[in-house]
Amino acid sequence: MMDGRSILMGRYEVGKQLGQGTFAKVYYARNLTTGQAVAIKMINKDKVMKVGLMEQIKREISIMRLVKHPNVLQLFEVMASKSKIYFVLEYAKGGELFNKIAKEGKLSEDSARRYFHQLINAVDYCHSRGVYHRDLKPENLLLDENENLKVSDFGLSALAESKRQDGLLHTTCGTPAYVAPEVLSRKGYDGAKADVWSCGVILFVLVAGYLPFHDPNLIEMYRKICRADFRCPRYFSAELKDLIHKILDSDPSTRISIPRIKRSTWYRKPVEINAKNSEAATTNSISSGVATTSGSAECSTSEENQGSLSLPNLNAFDIISLSTGFNLSGFFEDTHGHQEERFTTRQPVTTVLGKLKELAKRLKLKVKKKDNGVLRLAAPKEGKKGFLELDAEIFEVTPSFLLVELKKTNGDTMEYRKLVKEDIRPALKDIVWVWQGDEHLNSQSILQGEQQQSPLPPELPQDQLQPSLPQQEKQDMPEPPLLPQVPQEEVQTSIPAEQTKN
């Protein structure tokens, strides 16, 4: 604590609670160094572990690090203590798109088109990275201060590698009113096509102000979804009706794809330009496919310049595993067949490189210098499983604090472990401060001077919460109708999907 304020890890001043869920609370916070407003999601580690959601947390971290896009909520960094996991997220000042619709009512087609463009661009980018959201809905679409859309909540997302041999996903998840028919069937489904369906439901909601599929009886609602039984309001333009019927096609094999959506007449109409932040700037960022952030865990490639070596930086999540007390490697990573060794050092990078080269010379290992502080060390003789090779990569935690990772890239694991134990560890003892996993070390001292954990912010009375702040996480509850159903006199008979297919 400093001056009566709640300070987390010596880096963030924590303010009012924004929302609360079963396993986490979300707080507004400010970066003490940059002054940047952020949202911090505090996850109760014990609760998550008890209900077996470790893999879901791990997946959410992996996916949010993988996806860097202007219309995807940015994960700046992840921190942890013994009892909590902290997601430091981009603060979406505009709140949920759901709340905007509930407060202001249905949008004009021009306004809806702008949000739909951003949604489709974000989803298309996620799919290009092998990520399928699987829970797209207005509650998971946030708005920044310029009312640009941000896709959030990747807790139910799937990676392409999650597919079975048939190339399909098999886990039923998502919110019932937005879920595609093939997902409800509990058979294999294409994650990309299921996301497209959800985008269609969202588009309908934006312009109509209510859900296309809703019934007090959940089974009846499922039947409506599986039959694509819905009606468009009379005020929908012909082009919008045509597009929605092609998206909300119960047959995934004939459902319109994202490239075809982008070529549709309605989609290609001019988009409203936000006066605060022009669409052109967003488009330029989208075309690059990358949003650069200070907390990104991805390392940029650098080359030596005038004799100096540029090293990749590590954020707080990357150095959590430096001590036993903060070690989450078993929680976030598959430790079976562990093939990495890590140590920290306060020696300069030139000393570390010199020591590694000296070690290689003594062991008669071939040395190949790579970019970004990486040395490839290779055994001169072939072993049980080919030539043993390992990479030594150096990361900069702070200018005076380095992390060195030794990782086997080829050869027999037992030979690698023997080499580390009998040769590498003894040879590097003069420069090593601590090897990861050494139990005799004081876990808290490793991060001394880098991070100081302060008490968590106290519980805030509900009457102190600002109603204008977005609720970024809510209790799980049965899906209610988004808004009251439109009067029947405003509804016209739907056009059969078969008549709208190309």
From Swiss-Prot:
Record's compositionally biased regions (Polar residues): 493-502
Record EC number:
2.7.11.1
Give me the ranges of the annotated region Disordered. 447-502
Matching InterPro entries: Kinase-like_dom_sf (IPR011009), NAF/FISL_domain (IPR018451), NAF_dom (IPR004041), Prot_kinase_dom (IPR000719), Protein_kinase_ATP_BS (IPR017441), Ser/Thr_kinase_AS (IPR008271)
Q: Report the residue ranges that make up the NAF domain in this protein.
A: 297-333
User: Do the record's keywords include Kinase?
Assistant: yes
Which superkingdom is the protein from?
Eukaryota
For this protein, the record's PROSITE patterns field holds: NAF (PS50816), PROTEIN_KINASE_ATP (PS00107), PROTEIN_KINASE_DOM (PS50011), PROTEIN_KINASE_ST (PS00108)
Q: Name one GO biological process term.
A: signal transduction
User: Domain Protein kinase spans what residues?
Assistant: 12-267
Residues involved in ATP binding: L18, G19, Q20, G21, T22, F23, A24, K25, V26, K41
Gene3D superfamilies per record: Kinase associated domain 1, KA1 (3.30.310.80), Phosphorylase Kinase, domain 1 (3.30.200.20), Transferase(Phosphotransferase) domain 1 (1.10.510.10)
Keywords in alphabetical order: ATP-binding, Kinase, Manganese, Nucleotide-binding, Serine/threonine-protein kinase, Transferase
Chain positions covered by the region annotation PPI: 339-367
Q: Where is this region: Activation loop?
A: 153-182
User: Which molecular function terms from Gene Ontology are attached?
Assistant: ATP binding; protein serine kinase activity; protein serine/threonine kinase activity
What is this enzyme's catalytic activity, as reactions?
Answer: L-seryl-[protein] + ATP = O-phospho-L-seryl-[protein] + ADP + H(+); L-threonyl-[protein] + ATP = O-phospho-L-threonyl-[protein] + ADP + H(+)
Q: Which SMART domains match?
A: S_TKc (SM00220)
Induced by what?
A: By drought and salt stresses and abscisic acid (ABA).
User: Per the record, a Pfam family?
Assistant: Pkinase
**Group of enzyme by EC:** transferase
Q: Does the keyword ATP-binding apply?
A: yes
What family is reported?
Answer: Belongs to the protein kinase superfamily. CAMK Ser/Thr protein kinase family. SNF1 subfamily.
Domain notes, please?
The activation loop within the kinase domain is the target of phosphorylation/activation by upstream protein kinases. The PPI motif mediates the interaction with the ABI (abscisic acid-insensitive) phosphatases.
What's the protein name?
CBL-interacting protein kinase 11
Species the sequence originates in: Oryza sativa subsp. japonica
Gene giving rise to this polypeptide: CIPK11
